[in-house]
A protein has these predicted regions:
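Polar, enzyme-active/binding microenvironments
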Residues: 2-14, 18, 22-36, 41-374
C-alpha cells in the first residue's frame, strides 16, 4: 500500500477519457472528506498496481489506458475481440509472481467467483443507498440486532456472500469486478460489513453499544487488519417520520483504540427506506480531526424522537466498481489490468453501497467479482 500512495498523481486527462468526466468527478466528490489514510481502489482502471482515490478526492497510481480509448469502448472491444496482452509487472501480495497466481487459480482451484444481482430502490440525487436490505442475490439481509449488543457480521450472515476461507497460510484477495447497471453513471462500493446495531428511535437519551466487530481490530498503524479506513454509516431500514433530527453525541474508538466523539450528523426528515440518513453527498460519518478510521461504536444519540428504523453500521472498503454506460457490462480483467489484490479477510461479510446516486431512478446491478487465494 505504501508503494501505491507514494506513486505520482494519476494523469487526469487519461482518467477522464477512460471513465468519463462525470464518473471521475462523482468518485472524486465522494472522497473529498474521506478520513482514511489508505485510498480506495477504483476497479476497472488499467495500470500495474491499480488507480486509487484517497483523501481530498485525489487519484494516485499509474493509468495505462485512456490514451485513445474509454472503458466503454474497451467493453465493446472485449465483446468483439480477444483480451489484450498481459501487463508485465504487478504487485503480488500473497503471490510470488503473476505465474504463481495463474498456477494457484488454474491448477489448485483457488479462484472464487461471486455472482450478484441487486434490485435497488428509489433514491435521492446525491444520496447513498444500501444494497443490504434488497434482493435478489444475495438475498436481503435481516434488520439489525438491538443495542447494546448489536451483531458482528460474517459470511454466514443472511445477506452476505458465502465463501470458504482459504487454508492457512493462504490469504484471499480481490482480483476483479464486473458490473452492469440499469442506469448510469453509477458507482458501487464493495465493502466488508463488520458490525450493525439497531437504534431505539423513540428515545433521545444516549444509548450504549457494547458489541464489537471481529475484523479490522488491530490498533497498530499500517497493518493489513488495521481499522484505518473503516467507516460508519447510518442506514434507514424503515421509512422515517417527518421529524427534523440530528445525530448528536455518538461516541466511538478510533483506529488506534482511543475514545472519540463524532461531529454532528444531520439526518433527513421523512428519509426513504434504504437511503443512508446522511446529507446529500455524504456516505460515511465524519470522524474527529486526526482519526483515520473507526474501530468500535460505543454510543448513539438522536436529537428527536422519530418513527421508523435506523441501524448504525461499521464497514471497511474493498473497491469502487463504476458502471459507466447504461445496461452495458463493464468487463474488467483484474489480472491483465489493475492487478492490485486488496486483501479480503476470512469470514468477510461482503456487501454493496450505491454511492451518491446520480439520479432518483432505482438501479438494478448485475455482475460478478472474483477473488483468488495464495
Amino acid at each position: 500500500m505504501a508503494n501505491v500512495i507514494a506513486r505520482r498523481s494519476t494523469n487526469a486527462s487519461k482518467l477522464e477519457r477512460w471513465l468519463g468526466a462525470d464518473q471521475v468527478e462523482h468518485i472524486s466528490g465522494s472522497m473529498r472528506d474521506w478520513h482514511g489514510k489508505r485510498p480506495i481502489l477504483i476497479n476497472g482502471v488499467p495500470g500495474a498496481g491499480g488507480v486509487w482515490c484517497g483523501r481530498g478526492g485525489d487519484f494516485v497510481g499509474k493509468i495505462d489506458g485512456g490514451d485513445f480509448m474509454s472503458l466503454a469502448d474497451r467493453c465493446v472491444e472485449r465483446v468483439d475481440h480477444a483480451i489484450g496482452k498481459v501487463a508485465k509487472r504487478h504487485r503480488m501480495h500473497g503471490f510470488s509472481s503473476l505465474s504463481d497466481l495463474i498456477n494457484e487459480v488454474s491448477n489448485f482451484g483457488k479462484r472464487k467467483d461471486f455472482i450478484y444481482q441487486k434490485q435497488g430502490s428509489a433514491s435521492v440525487t446525491g444520496g447513498t443507498n444500501t444494497m443490504w436490505r434488497v434482493g435478489t442475490y444475495p438475498p436481503a439481509g435481516n434488520a439489525a440486532a438491538n443495542a447494546p449488543g448489536g451483531a458482528a457480521l460474517n459470511d454466514a450472515t443472511l445477506g452476505a456472500f458465502f465463501f470458504v476461507n482459504p487454508s492457512s497460510p493462504d490469504t484471499q484477495h480481490f482480483v476483479r469486478g464486473d458490473v452492469l447497471s440499469s442506469t448510469a453513471p453509477r458507482t458501487l462500493l464493495l465493502y466488508d460489513r463488520l458490525f450493525e446495531v439497531n437504534k431505539t428511535m423513540s428515545s433521545t437519551t444516549t444509548e450504549a453499544v457494547t458489541g464489537v466487530p471481529t475484523r479490522y481490530q488491530n490498533t497498530a498503524d499500517d497493518q493489513p487488519d488495521s481499522a484505518d479506513g473503516s467507516f460508519l454509516f447510518i442506514e434507514t431500514q424503515a421509512v422515517l417520520g417527518a421529524t427534523a433530527h440530528n445525530w448528536t453525541v455518538c461516541t466511538y474508538t478510533d483506529h488506534n483504540g482511543n475514545a472519540a466523539t463524532l461531529p454532528l450528523v444531520t439526518g433527513n426528515a421523512s428519509n426513504i427506506v434504504n437511503r443512508l440518513d446522511h446529507p446529500v453527498g455524504q456516505w460515511f460519518c465524519p470522524l474527529a480531526t486526526g482519526d483515520n478510521g473507526i474501530r468500535t461504536l460505543t454510543q448513539m444519540q438522536c436529537s428527536a424522537s422519530v418513527t421508523g428504523t435506523v441501524a448504525f453500521v461499521i464497514g471497511h472498503p474493498i473497491a469502487f466498481m463504476p458502471a459507466v454506460v447504461t445496461n452495458m457490462l463493464t468487463i474488467v480483467d483484474g489480472i491483465n489490468t489493475a492487478f492490485n489484490l486488496t486483501r479480503i479477510f476470512d469470514d468477510a461479510c461482503l456487501a454493496f453501497l450505491d454511492v451518491n446516486a446520480s439520479s432518483t431512478t432505482a438501479a438494478t446491478f448485475t455482475g460478478q467479482f472474483v477473488t483468488a487465494s495464495g
